[in-house]
Amino acid sequence: MYKLVLIRHGESTWNKENRFTGWVDVDLTEQGRNEAYQAGELLKEAGYTFDIAYTSVLKRAIRTLWHVQDKMDLMYLPVVHSWRLNERHYGALSGLNKAETAAKFGDEQVLVWRRSYDTPPPALEPTDERAPFNDPRYAKVPREQLPLTECLKDTVARVLPLWNESIAPAVRAGKQVLIAAHGNSLRALIKYLDGISDSDIVGLNIPNGVPLVYELDENLKPIKHYYLGDQEAIAQAQAAVAKQGKAG
């Protein structure tokens, strides 16, 4: 049996402001930093250790990983930073308040943009300052692979090559792997691991800063998964994530 630990970054400044973030590189709030430290404490108390970690190239995930490593005294851990673990790109919605967007376009439309599998938000113009083409962190990524918007289906297609070529081989080699990433890049991976249908994935909400443990068989198929921590508080956090895109 193998174990894999996933963690969504702690609360970011735009999570707090209920804004669509995507590839915009916002930082953690004080609460987000505390969530990351608490995650590290939970993992340490439960006896976990790691051989390698994976994260995105966005600072909210990177700092979350730092705080977990710090709490676990694992600052020396090898870390792979990959754009493939970035949050889903929200296109022209990037920076907009979710509730205000729902008031303008309707809860149903925003739910489709946020949670449907194959409907992306409106795309950015290539000349938009939010487009990734001139960002130095993507200088080595072929331009045609850089998105101007994404649906979850696109995010799955972006994440899976990293899983197949790097993460899964590390797990099979017996390495203890930690992934610190984002709500939708983790939803993409979980959809693949658990075989969740395109329609059911709408209902999957991942709370900030809570370790999610997957126990996998020899074929890397999930045996079970569970969050570490106060289960009632985790359920409340998941419900709060689900409500973010509503006008009320």
Swiss-Prot record:
Its EC number is 5.4.2.11. The active site is at 9 (tele-phosphohistidine intermediate), 87 (proton donor/acceptor). Substrate binds at residues 8-15, 21-22, 60, 87-90, 98, 114-115, 183-184. Keywords: Gluconeogenesis, Glycolysis, Isomerase. The record marks 182 as: Transition state stabilizer. It catalyses: (2R)-2-phosphoglycerate = (2R)-3-phosphoglycerate. GO terms for molecular function: phosphoglycerate mutase activity. CDD domains: HP_PGM_like (cd07067). It is an enzyme of class 5 (isomerase). Pfam families: His_Phos_1 (PF00300). Pathway: Carbohydrate degradation; glycolysis; pyruvate from D-glyceraldehyde 3-phosphate: step 3/5. SMART domains: PGAM. GO terms for biological process: gluconeogenesis; glycolytic process. Homodimer. Belongs to the phosphoglycerate mutase family. BPG-dependent PGAM subfamily. Catalyzes the interconversion of 2-phosphoglycerate and 3-phosphoglycerate. This is 2,3-bisphosphoglycerate-dependent phosphoglycerate mutase. It comes from Burkholderia cenocepacia (strain ATCC BAA-245 / DSM 16553 / LMG 16656 / NCTC 13227 / J2315 / CF5610).
